[in-house]
Structure formats: structure tokens, C-alpha cells
Amino acid sequence: MAATPQSLFPSGDDLDSSQLQMEPDEVDTLKEGEDPADRMHPFLAIYHLQPLKLHPLVFAPGVPVIAQVVGTERYTSGSKVGTCTLYSVRLTHGDFTWTTKKKFRHFQELHRDLLRHKVFMSLLPLARFAVASSPAPEGDSREIPSLPRAGPEGSSRRTASKQKYLENYLNRLLTMSFYRNYHAMTEFLEVSQLSFIPDLGCKGLEGVIRKRSGGHRVPGLTCCGRDQVCYRWSKRWLVVKDSFLLYMCLETGAISFVQLFDPGFKVQVGKRSTEARYGVRVDTSHRSLILKCSSYRQARWWAQEITELAQGPGRDFIQLHRHDSYAPPRPGTLARWFVNGAGYFAAVADAILRAQEEIFITDWWLSPEIYLKRPAHSDDWRLDIMLKKKAEEGVHVSVLLFKEVELALAINSGYSKKALMLLHPNIKVMRHPDQVTLWAHHEKLLVVDQVVAFLGGLDLAYGRWDDLHYRLTDLGDSSESAAPQPPTSCSDLPATPDLTHNQLFWLGKDYSNLITKDWVQLDRPFDDFIDRETMPRMPWRDIGVVVHGSPARDLARHFIQRWNFTKTTKTKYKIPIYPYLLPKSTSTANQLPFTLSGGQCATVQVLRSVDRWSAGTLENSILNAYLHTIRESQHFLYIENQFFISCSDGRTVLNKVGDEIVDRILKAHKQGQCFRVYVLLPLLPGFEGDISTGGGNSIQAILHFTYRTLCRGEYSILHRLKAAMGTEWRNYISVCGLRTHGELGGHPVSELIYIHSKMLIADDRTVIIGSANINDRSLLGKRDSELAVLIEDTEMEPSLMNGVEYQAGRFALSLRKHCFSVILGAAARPHLDLRDPVCDAFFQLWQDTAESNANIYEQIFRCLPSNATRSLRALREYVVVEPLATVSPPLARSELNQVQGHLVHFPLKFLEDEYLLPSLGSKEGVMPLEVWT
């Protein structure tokens, strides 16, 4: 006779434990004495989440789960007569400990679910073989102690006895994988696949919750209607960690949203703030998330737990820090500087090889086919191929690219995205923004496993690789370096030449001179676009830095914020193939799987410029750090920057970096203090244009605002200094550029060294390195997005400052001395002492070197820009005269032997008689002035 449904599915009201007895092969053997941390789930599990009801592996194999009923709460329900008891259950799994609160009826519901599970499994012929298990230890009883029946609450002795019964009941079940891994048990214990990943931090609050749609603080995502009209409620699995919360789709296991805690964090309970009975409202700068609980008591409990997590381990991110940065100063950080792209790219390549979990990249421009180590003799060091190999190993690569206005920029981010996305499913690329046409994502960042982060001025793009030689030519052996045609299908990697005997440093599009000609046909990466037989390349000077540990976590968090923001705001990225990213906890930040050699210990703080359009929040901590560092400097400032547009007039230019420099010099002059300011800028802006005819509208527009900052007009630095001290300003500030020379086509050639650095050194103790130029675009926060780090030395070494013994920081001093050594040609001047940047002798040597080199280059090449050309008429007359390098190459070579290093004075009088802003009739003239500033 067939069994009735009643006999198959007992009610479970009496919690008869005999119905849950296990056969010997169903009892899980626990391995005591092992290190639990070694058996916890790897971080990559976040990319392979499954629906909860598919019984995914939640607990670490072999690591026991121990339950302890630590207390009870008795309360009177508002809708019932009598009291209810809430049991606090503390659970431990390895290093993870968490508490859940349950009523007795929850135990009854669990018992019924487990009974149904056992009955169903007993009806499946192969069910016994589907459970991975082993025999129980000898003498281990397989009977589960019976639970007391439900009844009225009695004495404290009876309550304590009931606690012990519940505790034994749970612990007995938790030794059996058959029940422990069942979804009803994991829901009861409030655990998921994200609970026991050490890099995600402590085990926080979890459970099934109802959440309300909407609440985003992003234009276009905010509903202006009322709850019942515009919103919908959905059941989700909520996970709260120390610095964020997320919810997952119950049906698929996919992460549906991630809310990072930030200074806008606030938790509220009640219908007034949530418009929902038993509601909890979690506010951040990006969203007001409304959750609905089953009771007011649960709402208070959840609000308390979320708040305690955020104010405890996650407190770093719910408050602003020095300079109003989202990240605090991180002492004891390993940091290493890089001057020029050769060392930076090589270190990036080494870090990519060490990646085990994730690689994050964001650039203004990314060229997939660049080589990170040169000269290349194979494709092993080609960026796209390296990323493809790591993706094949299981590493997840996430790339954020600036989506340019194609009519204005020729960086072809669409090609870069396609080229990378076709390599492997583990490589995901997103572009942003769509609607913003004036501003850019200008930051440059690469993060490996959220423990090592590179940033600075260097995009992983054409033209950026260079070394201290600043070569103007790269001819090699043309027979060995002929580039093939690009592929006919973009599904193939671009073919490369046979590199076995390659001698070239810059292949194809990498050989460039951005003022002579901007890049074209980027989908043909190995075709030259300028004639390297007749045109010298333009050397590229840049500064980068790598940091380890907590600052790398902070930088990864910034990337994750931008990635998740882009996924949320752009409809095309809401599909599951673009995953939400999760930040690792700072609690494991010092567990470094690898470090790069050459690092020095310092205090590092991450700074940024972001706005609502770029990251969903506003911050301009880079500007604040610049102003503070200049204001507090005691001896000198050394600035290398691609742009220098400052000195606020309250209308056109708003940042006050130049104003702070003026104030600091005036303070030194008033106090009779020796104070120096060194400023290095590119001799010309990096836009395509013929400087012999004035350079074009873009070049002239940037020159206008640069000269307005330096020396022209009432707001300029030199105008204000001259008004206060006359010619003595020359004792305080020097403005220079860099130039070099070489041989091409049988005669000498010269070219400026394009300074793309974004660096400030103060007093040989403080350094700012990043992607931010000195202009409003980079510094105000409301325009371009930028990243930087403020590095403060904690390890000192003896040096000199104005002839007096001085304790200089190892990081800042080594960086500054390296820069000065290359700039001044110290390799050919063995007696040059670079320790003291302030004394009169060194400052005079600096000025004399710049003047001598500038005079020689002007005599030999009649190079531009020049102080001799103060008007367009003078410029036309100047360029028609044949330079000595053409007329008499041997004599020119002889004179060039007198050049020392690369330093030349910046020509402050170039085209000073001309109005350099574009005319209104030009396309540049109709653009807002903010584009140039």
C-alpha cells in the first residue's frame, strides 16, 4: 500500500529527532587541528556564485561549525497575548564568528524542512552516492538529542535547559554535511557563498529581505513618484560586510547591487523615513536603499548590526579624512617611484605575471598592442597577450576606458574595447561616459589582486615608453623590422613582425611626435604613421609610482566605485556578463602575496578628483593637498607638470595653486628666508600644429592661459612678484623646460622633451604623484576625474638644506636627486653635488645651465618657441633663416658638445605681442573657455 503524503512528510511539530538519524556513510568527518584559514573559500568564488537552493558549497570543507546558544530575550508581542523568547545563537566557523537570533518556531520550521529533504533524498535511487561523506568516528553517536516540545515559557531553569537542548540539536546537525549544506540550514544560519571569504572581511549580517526599487541619487535613475505607483518590492539575499552591503538574486545567485559605505552613510528605522512598515533605510552618497523586515524588532536589529559594522571595521570610509579625501593616510606603506615609462612598464609587466585573482585597469587611453619590456624579441611582453594569458589562467580582468568624443580625439577607445573583449570571456571592458562631452576620465591606474597598485601620468598607450636617454631616432634594421599588414578580421590578434632580431624600441604607431602629427588608424598598430627616416620622435617624460597594501586597497575601492557606478548607470552594462566588483577588506591588506623590489617605507594617502558624473560623488582632495603642501613648505618646491594654468581671477580660472606659490614666496621674502621654486613644463602644449606658423588654435589657447599664469596680466605669478620685490623674484623661482638632440639623416636634429609628469616635491620629505595637471580641469573635481597619492617620508637620511645638515626623506630625496641628475647631465659632471637644492651655488648652477643650453640650441637649431619671436611677424622672419645644423653640421656638432643635460629656460616672451585665444570664427573659438583651463 502506498504511503500517504502525511506519512511521507511528517509535520515536525514534535521535532522527533529519530526521523533525522543518519546512516554511517552520511555522517561527515570533521578534521580537527587543521588551520581553518587555509581551507576557506578563495576570493575568486565571488565570480562563480550559484542559486542558494542548488546547495552550493558554503562552509569550508573539514572546518567545523560550532553553535552556542548564548542568551535569550523575552518580549511581549503587540498582536498576541503572552511572551515570546528569542534565542541568540553564536556560531563559529574557523576564524569567523557571528550571531543570529531565532524563535523556537524557526527551529521547528528548520526541522520540517530537513525532514522533507531527507524523505526526498531517500526516494532518489542515487541520492546516497550524491553526498560526499565518510564513516563517522568510532564511538560517535548518530542519534540527535530530542528537542523539547513547544509550550508556554516557564522558569529560568527550564529556559536554560531548553537553550542547551537547542544547542546540542544544532551542533549534532552541523556535523552532518547532508544537513549542514542544505539550503534551509544555510538560510537558518544566515550564511552564503560570500560569508567565509577572508578577503571580504568579517562575517556580517545576512538573510532574506525585501528591498524596494529606486532610490538612486543619479540623474535618470531617480523616480519622482510615490511608492505604490513607481516602486516595486523584491525578495533578495542581503549581505553586509565591513565597508559595503550587497543583495543577490535568490533565483540565480547573481549580485544585483553593491552599496559602498561612504561619508553619506546613515541608517534609519521607521515608517516616517522609509515609507514602509518595519522598514530600514540605508543612505549613502549614491543611493537610499529601503529594506522591509518582518517585524519592528528585526528592523532594529538589522539597523544596529549594519551601523556597528560600518562604524567598526568600516569606519575609514564613512568619514572624510585629511584634505577631505575618502581615504586616510596609511603609514608603513611600501612605495616605489618611476621616472619615465621604461621602468614603470617593466614593473607593470612583472606585476601582471604575479596576478592570481584580479587585474583592474583604467586609462585615458589604452593601446592593447604596446610592449611593456623593450626591445621586444617576442610577443611575451605585449600587453594584450599578457592579459589573455592571465585570463586563461582564471584571472578576471576589468578595464574602464574613457569614451571620447570621436570628432575631438583620435584615441579610438572603441577599437581598444573590441580588441580586448575578443581575447577571453574573463576580460571585461566598459567605456564611460556617454553624455558628458567636455570632461574626461583622465586617471591612470592598474591594480593587481587589490594589493599592488600603479598610478601616475602614464597611460598604457603609444608614445609613453621612454628612458633616461630620450632617443630622437629609432631606425634599427629596416629589413628586420618591416611591419606586416594588420589582420582582416578584428577577431584575430594584430599580427606582429618577426621580432627575433628586432632592434626597435618603438614599433609602428609607438614611434610618434604628437605635435607634428596626431595618431591615426589605430586599428593598424604596426604601421608607421610618420616617416622615421626624416622625422625625429618626441621624447616623453613622465612620473609613476607603485604602492602596496592598504593604499592599493583604497585605489581598488575607487576603481570598484567607478566600475559599479558605470554598470548601474549604463543600461548596456546591466547584463550579467558584466559583474559587480567587490572591495577587499583592509583587515587583510598587509597580507602581501608579493612585493616589487626597490620599495621604500612611507605614509601614503590616496587623493582624487571626482564628480557626480564620473563617480557619483564630489571630491577635490588633490587640490586641497597641493594647496596645503605649498603653504606648509619650508625650503623649496619642485614641480613637474604637463600644464600650469592657475592664479584665480574668480571667473575664468578658479584653482589657487599659483596664488599659494606667490604667497609662499612673498612670505619668504618678507622673512628674509631662502626659498626656491623650480617649475618644469613642456616647451609647447601637446597638440598637433605647425609651431613655425604659430602652432594652431589649440596650442595657442593653452599658451595663452599658461602665460597668463606665469608672466602676463595682473593675476600672473611674475607680475605680482615684481610688484612686491622688483627683480629679486629671480632669486626665488625658475621656470624651465627640457630639450635634447641627436642625429638623423646625416645632420643634427633637436626636439623638446614632452613633460607629461604630474609631480610635486616639497622639502625632500613630501611628494605628490598622480594624473592631475595643474589646471581647473584636473583639480576642481567637477571636471576631469583624477587620481594621486600624497607620500610623506618616515625614514630619513642625512642631507643638506641651504648649507645646513638636514634630515631628508629617503623616498623624496632619491626621486628628486634622480630627476636633477638626468636634467643637469650629472653623469658628465662627476663633481656635481645634488644634495642641497636651496643654496645659492646650486640655484645659480641651475639657472646658468638652463641659460647656456637654451642659447646653444637656439644658435644651432633656431628652435621654437623662442624669446626672439615676440610676434607672428617676427616668427615668420625667424623661421626663414637656415639653422647652423643645416648649414654646417660639423660645426653644429662641435657646439652641441657644450650642452649639459636637458635643461633650458622656458621662453616667457614667446608671442607676447599676440592675442593667443582662438578667434570666434574657429571651432576652437566657440568652445567654452573651461575646456582649456
From Swiss-Prot:
Reactions accelerated catalytically: a 1,2-diacyl-sn-glycero-3-phosphocholine + H2O = a 1,2-diacyl-sn-glycero-3-phosphate + choline + H(+); 1,2-dihexadecanoyl-sn-glycero-3-phosphocholine + H2O = 1,2-dihexadecanoyl-sn-glycero-3-phosphate + choline + H(+)
Changes after translation: Phosphorylated by FGR.
CDD domains per UniProt: PH_PLD, PLDc_vPLD2_2
Keywords: Cell membrane, Hydrolase, Lipid degradation, Lipid metabolism, Lipoprotein, Membrane, Phosphoprotein, Repeat
Subcellular location: Cell membrane
EC number: 3.1.4.4
Annotated Pfam families: PLDc, PLDc_2, PX
Domain PX: 65-195
Subunit (UniProt): Interacts with PIP5K1B. Interacts with EGFR.
Official protein name in the record: Phospholipase D2
UniProt source species: Bos taurus
